[in-house]
Design a protein with these regions (language model features):
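Structural motif corresponding to alpha-helix initiation and N-cap regions
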Residues: 1-2, 71
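Flexible hinge/capping segments at coil-to-helix
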Residues: 2-43
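Short beta-strand->loop
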Residues: 4-14, 89, 97-111
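Secondary-structure junction motif
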Residues: 23-26, 36-58, 124-132, 141-142
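Hydrophobic hinge/microswitch elements
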Residues: 44-102
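A late-sequence structural motif
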Residues: 102-142
């Protein structure tokens, strides 16, 4: 079965934590992540590779306490104070309002990518086309 990826957009990756975890971090961001308990996407994803490279470039050695395949579960662990979590910038306001997480900073030039996956090369369904068009209002052009 063939499928086609249609890029919806890219956005910066932010780091968020519960207020209690954020208070325990010391020093300026991103050095405050050194030794901190963090929650990450699984290591077989492009965003994880980019985050690992960014952390290494910052000279930061966090303590990885969990790896997740979806942001909903990652958010719940962060909400319950289990660690600092990377969050796509487009979800920061939602995570702040719904989970009480606070932003700590962004991961430099690391970008999360979002795709619509379809069975058609050229999208025809009006609803899917509308989503693709609206995505440019949500995502940055980086």
């Amino acid at each position: 079965i063939g499928s086609y990826n249609h890029l919806l957009g890219r956005c910066a990756e932010s780091w968020m934590a519960s207020p209690a975890v954020a208070k325990r971090l010391s020093g300026p961001f991103p050095k405050s992540l050194d030794g901190a308990r963090i929650l990450l996407p699984t290591d077989d994803t492009a965003i994880r590779v980019a985050l690992d490279q960014w952390l290494d470039k910052q000279g930061v050695r966090p303590f990885i306490v969990g790896e997740f395949e979806d942001y909903a579960l990652l958010r719940e662990f962060a909400r319950h104070g289990r660690g600092v979590a990377p969050v796509p910038e487009v979800l920061v306001d939602q995570f702040r309002k719904e989970s009480g997480l606070v932003p700590l900073g962004t991961a430099g030039k690391v970008r999360a990518e979002f795709y619509a996956i379809s069975m058609e090369r050229k999208l025809r369904h009006p609803g899917v086309v509308a989503i693709l068009e609206k995505a440019s209002d949500v995502f940055d052009s980086a």
